[in-house]
Amino acid sequence: MCNMRNRYSLFLVLIIIFLSSLSTVCARTFEGSINFVRETVFDTTRINIYVKDSMVRVDERDTKNRLVSSHIVNLDKEEVYALSYSKELYKKLLVSSYSNDNGRISVKKTQNSKEINGHTCSQWRVRDERMNTEVAYWMCDGEFEFFSKLLNLLRRTEYSLAIFGAIPEVGGFIPMLTEERTLLRKEKLKIRIVDIEYNNPSSSLFGIPSHFKSVNRLS
């Protein structure tokens, strides 16, 4: 009887360990960097996103790879800071109450799929009659929960990632390729992910340099 109790206790311990490890794996979210290229008929720019825990940094660079804007986001605290490295200044952006403006757009999750950079992607088409645009998002399902939170937060500030703002609730998806066209099918812009790196970014990326001064406006 004692042996049976011991075996049963051991079995319970093993089950608990298994469930704990399973829950850790399931809760795991992306950490690392994601690099986008934004192409229009006029120029090509880059968007670099760094993720560590609940912190996100978004850098935008111009055609000559010069830093145009830099933002640090705390997803848990819902805080967004804009930084100017040339002026050594920073500003905390106002985050407004959530408002859902998706009533003006229609979303169709099509059956189309294709492989992009080794990832199988599904096509979501978002149509906005008022803006005379249709955007095709080739969405990759993964551990990118931060992306939905980031978009929902940024669209409530004066800064946004522009075309990504039209994406509805995306869960763990991220667009590997974004194609915007007019309703007459004329291409306006294209944004594609060129690199995804799983790593542990330095915490210094998500801090505001101590010598930067706080201001009400950066321009």
Residue ranges and their predicted role:
Residues 27-219:
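Extended soluble regions of mature proteins
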Residues 12-21:
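Bacterial N-terminal signal peptides
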Residues 2-12:
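Bacterial N-terminal signal peptides that target proteins for export
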